């Protein structure tokens, strides 16, 4: 991104801080997009975050986090649907933004395969909708599931049956066949739907993608049936027999079975033909009648696809070549400051409504105070140093979804007297000092739990699906209960039944509640007094501690008593507890500091202790012993691995009973060093620890 310091100029400490920030931002974007069908940043901004994260990981492989966004697919599941575990994972795609990146992808494929001849590819439009997997047994549709987090989706079978161009029976199909594709809504149908919504006085949808996703995920199939959804098939999952030998032949087979496939799919050789097809599809984009945001390229030979395989979250044999963002000019009417769960002050532009790429937008992200001032977080100019002022005419862009980004300012149209924007140095919600920590690009409220905005956002996080997931207590209910003074901290939720059971009428008389729903809520709260350790750690809402990190911490410490005692004794920067914390692969100094600091802040600790008094915390699951050459050994991976991703290597080692550490110590048994290993390899040599390369590791575990 243009407002960021070049990766090759970052110090190791700056890179670690940046990776932590990116992990937090990408996780929030994933949840908004995949779980709530309500994106908070544009596709272009999201792609840029992922791209920068990948670039930093490549420059500093030893800093790669265990919860790296590079390994994540989709988001958490929504409430109300049964879970479906995908027999074959539904992965996301790597992105390319120009010809050079497409050529690099092709070259990586050639190197991986040792292939010097011509390669054939398919090119097809990337539909902007909701991914769906359809399972057919003996030719009958038996299950439909959303992508979810890639491993587990939502069962939307009855809703999917209402989609007109989705066959419920197949003639001549394999006994088992999972067909995958995209549910979408045409522009014409979207306009008609919003017209009906407006006439009925109901909420309008922001864009066709949100309308399609919201329609498919209705709890009442009759509502879905009333919505004009469509489906394009483009892939497959589990199958009892091959569909064909090539990608384009397999798509033709799906069409013969009765599925709608995209007519713009073409067979291409080399980057020049791919780029020509990309340009042709983009030329036709406005006339297609449905939203697309790029072109997907796939290796055509399915045998080669199988050889290429997958990284942690993307196939090696496919890539999405995205379109450039869409632009428009409008006037900035105001700047609001929102305060998030971790105290971040986020500026939001309030715009005179403008149509960008067919969608009316009125808000835009302004990132942080430096972005408004026309510089990046290191003081270097962006936009030629032009600052952003209320009243300015600004250029905004979007590339598929809601809140866009302010890209430029027209100084010639700046109103006389427009004043420089002064970013608040106190929290607009609680008045506490808002400070910027070294290396942080945002200003944060220091009020902690006395800040009402942080209170309510933390409570929302606490009841989220990956945390306590209390049925009947979602974000809206939490906000209402907080607003009326019923809850202020997580412990208050568990006091609700005792405090209000006698006066249950108080709750049932609230808007949206009845006696049954109130009784169900109290029962759900009681059920959550027993909680898994990793869920509790995640629910605390400590900065930088995501789901994956919470699981790592739970696995490492085993019990709440051990975890709580270690955090109590730990001191930032020194001591055995600190070193033990840093030994966890994926836990760096930034995350560890955040964790230890939280347990040493008086208000934070009081809230944690009050909560723990209500709970029975289940110990982390202990894996059964595994017989392998590395079982029980502590392994450190450093440098670049060429035959598998770091995440794949870590998963394989742990499956064989090894413990993967993020740092080298006297307790380390084996260091696996790839190119660019750096200080960890030197430290291992100094300690006399066995060091092997990737091939040696594969021989050791029997995968050579």
UniProtKB/Swiss-Prot annotation:
Which InterPro entries does the annotation name?
A: BRCT_dom, BRCT_dom_sf, DisA/LigA_HHH, DNA_ligase, DNA_ligase_AS, DNA_ligase_CS, DNAligase_adenylation, DNAligase_N
Gene it is expressed from: ligA
GO BP annotation list? DNA repair; DNA replication
| Record bears the keyword NAD | yes
The record places domain BRCT at 625-704
Protein's name in the database = DNA ligase
**Known catalytic reactions:** NAD(+) + (deoxyribonucleotide)n-3'-hydroxyl + 5'-phospho-(deoxyribonucleotide)m = (deoxyribonucleotide)n+m + AMP + beta-nicotinamide D-nucleotide
Cellular component terms (Gene Ontology): cytosol
What is the annotated signal peptide range for this record?
none
| Keywords from the UniProt entry | DNA damage, DNA repair, DNA replication, Ligase, Magnesium, Manganese, Metal-binding, NAD, Zinc
Q: What class of enzyme is it?
A: ligase
Spell out the catalytic residues: 126
Identify the domain of life. Answer: Bacteria
For this protein, the record's NCBIfam families field holds: dnlj, PRK07956.1
Give me the residues that bind Zn(2+), please: 427, 430, 445, 451
Name the family the entry cites: Belongs to the NAD-dependent DNA ligase family. LigA subfamily.
Give the required cofactors: Mg(2+); Mn(2+)
Main function: DNA ligase that catalyzes the formation of phosphodiester linkages between 5'-phosphoryl and 3'-hydroxyl groups in double-stranded DNA using NAD as a coenzyme and as the energy source for the reaction. It is essential for DNA replication and repair of damaged DNA.
Q: Which organism encodes this protein?
A: Cereibacter sphaeroides (strain ATCC 17029 / ATH 2.4.9)
* Intrachain S-S bonds: none
- GO MF annotations in UniProt: DNA ligase (NAD+) activity; metal ion binding
Kindly list the positions annotated as binding NAD(+). 43-47, 92-93, 124, 147, 182, 298, 322
* EC id: 6.5.1.2
